[in-house]
Design a protein with these regions (language model features):
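Short flexible loop/turn segments that cap and initiate beta-strands
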Residues: 76-100, 180, 191-208, 278-282, ...
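Proline/serine/threonine-rich low-complexity linkers at boundaries of modular beta-sandwich domains
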Residues: 40-49, 154-164, 243-249, 335-343
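Aromatic sugar-binding surface patches on proteins
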Residues: 105-113, 216-222, 292-295, 301-308
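Bacterial Sec-dependent N-terminal signal peptides
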Residues: 1-34, 365
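Acidic glycine/proline-rich low-complexity segments
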Residues: 30, 136-158, 373-453
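Beta-strand-rich structural segments
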Residues: 49-77, 165-192, 264-270, 322, ...
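Short, surface-exposed loop/turn segments at beta-strand-coil junctions that are enriched for proline
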Residues: 75, 110-121, 220-232, 310-316
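Short acidic/polar inter-strand loop motif in beta-rich domains
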Residues: 119-120, 130-139, 239-244, 323-333
Length: 455
């Protein structure tokens, strides 16, 4: 069966042609007009503000100064930008050891933060936010981990015994009895939070091996699994006798599986709810940062529904797929990334002159688009000694704006995911979204009383 999907855009209304593989025509979807109105209202009342900090480096000695430039971005629904940015430096206990604030002008601010001389060596966190951002989950503040060394040779960063933490993340949110599910997982060092490359096995209550698994990138991986509610499962890692729990298994529900094809995004919905869904109205919605992109009807009476969405009609960066019913309750959800953004071509040229015994470097920057047409921009340049900086372990502006800022917490080695020329990049991003991609926008807010901003 063929259906026309309405794609909502600020510029125009497009259509996606998708194929639905099922035995009967799907019923009418949730009213996209009403849903769009709800999204627009929520986006208007809760505009998204993001900050990015460009620093001189990420390794410092106590007593040194952190130099930075702050960049501010706003969602299209924002009518006013915050005027003050707050920047905190906190220790491993979450205690703020230094805070500064700067005025924002034209979406930017330049400044510095002096590191107290008495600080002990260790890992610290630099955090940036505005008062408006404090109305939402602080996990979406700008975060960056710093290493600060003490002034004494004896003041070394303490070494801790390695202890593993293993967590499982069913694609779409839940494990459903008897339905094949993709389960992503992450193995990290409990002390550092860094990914650990290892392998493990799923065991049943009798100790029988049900499924082996292995990490593929920075402690992350995935495998397919058919859970049985009557069984009890545990997981163990190689060389570790710790028993790790598998997420609970629901008797009934939906499972969402997403696969990247050459020219389409394939979405498979399976369910075992049964006859009670024959008169139910379900919709799979695509949305991004509070903006509704598409509404796809789903026939609740069918055990399987398959969509193939043309990639050239999908947005750049991260967007969300959510399956809802007519009361706007979410059944499963996941984040998806399909397109890298277009970037400017920057060409740097420099000249060096000697003045009063010192060398002075002048740098010229030429910015053009992919057609070679010059483009204006706001730029910052950091210069640091190589042993004090590890640029590959932190975000750049593109990775943060289009990827990491949509995830909770910090992304380990974000540049390892960001290579449009690498055929493995999308697979790595998939694992990142499946493990750290907790949803930013809960549709349950549509069914709750209005909450006034605290700030």
């Amino acid at each position: 069966h063929l259906c026309i999907l309405k794609i909502h855009s600020a510029l125009t209304i497009l259509c996606l042609l998708c194929t639905i593989h099922c035995a009967a025509a799907p019923q009418k979807a949730v009213s996209d007009t009403l849903l769009s109105a709800r999204f627009n209202r929520y986006a208007r009342e809760n505009p998204i503000e993001k900050l990015y900090l460009h620093q001189d480096r990420t390794n410092y000695y106590a007593g040194e100064t952190i130099w930075f430039k702050v960049y501010q971005t706003l969602s299209s629904s924002a009518t006013e930008a915050s005027r003050i940015v707050y920047i905190d430096l906190s220790n491993s206990k979450g205690e703020i050891v230094k805070q500064v604030k700067y005025p924002l002008a034209d979406g930017a601010a330049s400044g510095s933060l002096s590191i107290p001389e008495h600080l002990h060596a260790g890992h610290y966190q630099l955090r940036a936010y505005t008062r408006w951002m404090q109305n939402f989950d602080p996990e979406f503040f700008f975060h960056r981990e710093l290493t600060i060394y003490g002034n004494s040779e004896k003041d070394n960063i303490p070494q801790q015994t390695t202890k593993f933490k293993l967590r499982f993340f069913p694609e779409g949110g839940n494990l459903i009895n008897g339905l094949t599910s993709r389960i992503a997982f992450e193995v990290v060092d409990a002390n550092t939070g860094k990914g650990v490359q290892t392998e493990g096995v799923i065991l049943n209550a009798h100790g029988d091996s049900i499924r082996k698994f292995a990490t593929s990138h920075l402690g992350k991986g995935s495998f397919f699994f058919i859970p049985q509610k009557k069984e009890k499962y545990i997981a163990r890692l190689a060389g570790d006798n710790t028993d790790f729990k598998i997420p609970s298994i629901s008797e009934q529900g939906f499972v969402m599986t997403v696969k990247h094809l050459k020219e389409a995004l394939r979405i498979l919905l399976t369910q075992n709810i049964g006859p009670s869904t024959k008169n139910s109205v379900y919709s799979l919605i695509l949305h991004q940062e509070g903006r509704l992109i598409a509404v796809l009807p789903v026939d609740g009476s069918q055990p399987r529904t398959l969509f193939d969405l043309p990639l050239d009609k999908l947005p750049t960066g991260v967007f969300t797929l959510t399956l809802i019913d007519e009361d706007y309750h979410a059944y499963c959800e996941r984040l998806v990334f399909t397109h890298f953004p277009e970037t400017l071509n920057l060409k740097l040229s420099s000249t060096i002159s000697v003045q009063e015994g010192h060398r002075k470097m002048s740098v010229n920057i030429r910015s053009t688009d992919k057609k070679g047409i010059p483009q204006p921009g706001s730029f910052s340049l950091a210069v640091a000694q190589t042993f004090l900086e590890q640029p590959t372990i932190r975000d750049n502006f593109s990775t943060y704006l289009f990827l990491s800022s949509n995830l909770k917490g910090q992304t380990e080695q974000p540049l390892s995911y960001w290579n449009p020329e690498d055929t493995e990049s999308l697979s790595k991003i998939e694992l990142l979204l499946l493990t750290q991609g907790w949803r930013r926008y809960s549709l349950e807010v549509f069914n709750q009383p209005d909450n006034l901003p605290r700030y």
